[in-house]
């Protein structure tokens, strides 16, 4: 069974011409083994993913105050729910019936929401990456309210852009009665309909291949442009972390006593709490004005450490000595720990997105470069498509909605 020429994540119904039986041209096509396998995986993804995402939705919506990461997780949860409750049922119903019975209006609306669901997923992941980048570059990181407003604005723009990109589907997809004698109709792109109507007529190659350029533009907007933005953002963040994790006199207190190097959590914490990046300098100028009372950072090397508030009480003189050696209060400890967790959760979500989306979109590019090579890998395409659905299933596990709650009154809007 061939895939449509517009092999993008918005192409979610196989056209009638793709499953058309050449030996019996007058009969509707019948499902094959790969269709039943795909239907099984869709149902399995729904059974596992729907409860997880609904539980995540319930817990996220019950939180009285929202950090930046909570806002990003909410938007990602909304897009995952769209994928699981709009795309999965409609695709499964089509595989079950091999017929489109919703009429022209529903065909257009469903296709628009398909594109909207996948485009919003990509856009939210971009927001997560850009938020991590701005936490290093932007001065608003030191103002929690400004940072929270910035994240809200990014998400609003992301959803509006997803809606705008989805609207052309209203004009590209149509319900088409392919076999009137069997009342067998399909929801097809206008180019597929034109090819079917001209099946027995001489083919005229158009000067401007609208379908080709539409496919290139669409796959770029859905995946490749977001992927490039994500990669650039994390390259800058990782470069910033690496440069500023080099051993120096100023940060000797952040070394591990076992290895003599910065711990992983210390490096991650620095990426979210240091001053905004202006130039990639190595702090050559050591002669800085000494401040009368500076509070060094705490090394967050183990998330299971006992908070400082639970440690034995000490005398005032000992407390003064502890302050001089760089130990913060439990509030500072929790804030640094939450920043470190936020960075790791963000990185996990981005990595899962790349792993799940890249195979399908690579194959979609191959069809434009080498159709013969592309044809040899068609049997793997639906498996790669299921990886994209699986991404919506695994996201709640990655951002850990079932984990321990963080303090809602400390560091709000800073993560």
Swiss-Prot record:
Record family assignment:
Belongs to the G-protein coupled receptor 1 family.
UniProt keyword annotation of Metal-binding present: no
Q: What Pfam families does the record point to?
A: 7tm_1
According to its UniProt record, where is this protein located? Cell membrane
Query: What residue ranges carry the coiled-coil annotation?
Result: none
* Residues spanning the membrane: 36-56, 76-96, 109-129, 153-173, 223-243, 346-366, 383-403
Q: Which organism is this protein's natural source? A: Caenorhabditis elegans
Give me the ranges of the annotated region Disordered.
1-25
UniProt-listed GO biological process terms: G protein-coupled receptor signaling pathway; G protein-coupled receptor signaling pathway involved in dauer larval development; neuropeptide signaling pathway; regulation of cAMP-mediated signaling; regulation of dauer entry
Keywords from UniProt, A to Z, are:
Cell membrane, Disulfide bond, G-protein coupled receptor, Membrane, Receptor, Transducer, Transmembrane, Transmembrane helix
Known partners and oligomeric status: Heterodimer; with daf-37.
Under PANTHER family, the record lists: G-PROTEIN COUPLED RECEPTOR, G-PROTEIN COUPLED RECEPTOR DAF-38
Which residue windows does the record flag with biased composition (Low complexity)? Answer: 1-19
Q: Which cysteines are joined by disulfide bonds?
A: 107-187
Q: Which GO terms describe its molecular function?
A: G protein-coupled peptide receptor activity; protein heterodimerization activity
Q: Does the keyword Signal apply?
A: no
Q: In which tissues is it expressed?
A: Expressed in the ASI and ASK chemosensory neurons and in the IL-2 interneurons, but weakly expressed in other head neurons in hermaphrodites.
State the protein's purpose: G-protein coupled receptor (GPCR) that forms a heterodimer with daf-37 to control dauer formation and behavior. Required for the response to dauer inducing pheromones such as the ascarosides ascr#2, ascr#3 and ascr#5.
Q: Which residue ranges does the entry give as Extracellular-facing topology?
A: 1-35, 97-108, 174-222, 367-382
Q: What is this protein called?
A: G-protein coupled receptor daf-38
Q: Which GO terms describe its cellular component?
A: G protein-coupled receptor heterodimeric complex; plasma membrane
Q: What is its main location?
A: membrane
Taxonomic classification, please? Eukaryota, Metazoa, Ecdysozoa, Nematoda, Chromadorea
List the Cytoplasmic topological domains: 57-75, 130-152, 244-345, 404-415
Bilayer topology reads: Multi-pass membrane protein
């Amino acid at each position: 069974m061939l895939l449509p020429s517009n092999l993008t994540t918005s192409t979610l119904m196989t056209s009638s011409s793709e499953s058309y039986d050449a030996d019996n041209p007058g009969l509707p096509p019948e499902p094959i083994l790969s269709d039943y396998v795909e239907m099984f995986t869709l149902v399995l993804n729904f059974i596992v993913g729907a409860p997880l995402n609904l539980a995540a939705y319930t817990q996220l919506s019950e939180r009285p105050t929202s950090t930046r990461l909570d806002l990003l997780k909410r938007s990602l949860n909304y897009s995952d729910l769209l994928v699981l409750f709009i795309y999965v049922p409609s695709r499964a119903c089509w595989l079950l019936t091999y017929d489109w019975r919703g009429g022209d209006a529903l065909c257009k609306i469903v296709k628009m929401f398909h594109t909207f669901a996948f485009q919003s997923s990509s856009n939210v992941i971009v927001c997560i990456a850009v938020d991590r980048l701005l936490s290093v570059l932007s001065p608003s990181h030191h103002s929690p309210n400004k940072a929270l407003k910035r994240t809200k604005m990014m998400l609003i723009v992301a959803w509006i852009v997803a809606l705008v990109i989805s609207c052309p589907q209203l004009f590209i997809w149509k319900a088409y009665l392919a076999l009137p004698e069997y009342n067998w109709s399909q929801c097809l792109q206008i180019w597929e309909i034109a090819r079917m109507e001209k099946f027995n007529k001489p083919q005229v190659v158009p000067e401007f291949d609208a379908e080709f350029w539409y496919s290139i533009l669409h796959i770029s907007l859905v995946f490749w442009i977001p992927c490039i933005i994500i990669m650039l953002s994390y390259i800058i963040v990782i470069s910033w972390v690496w440069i500023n994790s080099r051993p120096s006199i100023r940060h000797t207190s952040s070394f591990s006593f076992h290895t003599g190097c910065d711990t992983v959590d210390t490096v991650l914490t620095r990426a979210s709490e240091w001053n905004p990046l202006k130039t990639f300098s190595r702090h050559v100028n050591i002669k800085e004005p000494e401040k009368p009372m500076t509070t060094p950072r705490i090394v967050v090397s183990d998330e299971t450490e006992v908070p400082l508030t639970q440690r034995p009480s000490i005398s005032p003189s000992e407390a003064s000595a502890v302050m001089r050696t760089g130990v913060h209060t439990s509030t500072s400890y929790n804030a640094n720990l939450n920043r470190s967790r936020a960075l790791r959760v963000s990185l996990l979500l981005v990595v899962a997105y790349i792993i799940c989306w890249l195979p399908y979109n690579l194959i979609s590019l191959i069809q434009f470069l080498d159709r013969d090579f592309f044809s040899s890998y068609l049997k793997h395409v639906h498996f790669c498509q299921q990886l994209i659905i699986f991404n919506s299933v695994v996201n709640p596990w990655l951002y850990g909605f079932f984990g321990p709650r963080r303090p809602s009154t400390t560091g709000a809007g800073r993560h």
